Amino acid sequence: MINLMKQGLGHRTPQQEAVPWGRKFSRMDNFWPRDGSCPLRFSERIERAKMIQKHELPILEYDSNSEEVIRPNHGAEQLKLPEKCVYAFLGEAVDDYAFEAEATVAETFETITRNYPVYIVKQDGMEFCLCAAPLGAPAAAQLMDFLISCGCKKIISTGSCGVLTDLAENEFLIPVKALRDEGTSYHYLPASRYIELNKNIRDAIEHTLLVQNIPFQECVTWTTDGFFRETQDMVRYRGAEGCTTVEMECAALAACARKRGASFGQILYTADSLANIDAHDERDWGKGSLRKALELCIAVLQTI
């Protein structure tokens, strides 16, 4: 079980208490490496501090130093997951499929909200990881970062999106780039307005949909943290900029994957409509696409 709530991250080891140089260990003074070596000396700390790109707005500040205090695989250093992964915003449909496929549970990622089983599926000569994704960029990126750190390097995600134009429900879309209107991606990559998704994975998704004779469109998606702050003027503005869909994770997941050296792509299916800003249409939230979207992700993995 991976439980970040129970790891005792605030306690120092006896080795840290006995710091050389004749003084107490301090979080503000030194970082004690995991290999037991000496803390960073003052000159080294100064050099690392230079890696922080500072800005008046905190969201635009970025630390290019990849040595995090808490590594993504914290507590599961020995876990080795398959290279291929389906990471799906499909709720119980993921667990249902895992049960039908007689999947095994390699690990359980625990959070205060719910636990996420990490399934291993063996199907048609392929072994892949299957995991349900939590709603929202911070939670989704945290779990995907964990999966990558444990071995997943080719990740196909799927989930619903709202539409800003006149698109029918349950249509499939392939995001080419995502507008970074969330906060999480800025912790993985320096600031930019958009992030492009991996072309090789996009091509594999397009090939799979073409082979199965499934209509699709490419799209520019608007990734936002503010579900209830999709204002009328902002919807118009994003639409004028070229965004045709809105969701809450794509930009963050693409940034996380790029930072960690993984390949990531996503299949979106249309749910509610914001095309008429005076009358939001929930429709059926794209529920008719859940199973097909999951099957398409698995089919894409067969080609990469």
Residues covered by each model-derived region:
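Non-catalytic positions within long, well-ordered alpha-helices that form the structural scaffold/packing
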Residues: 148-149, 239, 258
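Metabolite-binding pocket within alpha/beta catalytic cores that recognizes anionic/polar moieties
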Residues: 48-195, 199-203
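Active-site rim beta-loop-alpha module in soluble metabolic enzymes
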Residues: 195-240
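His/Asp/Glu-rich mid-to-C-terminal helical/loop segments that flank catalytic regions of hydrolases
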Residues: 274-304
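Zn-dependent metallopeptidase/amidohydrolase metal-coordination segment
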Residues: 251-285
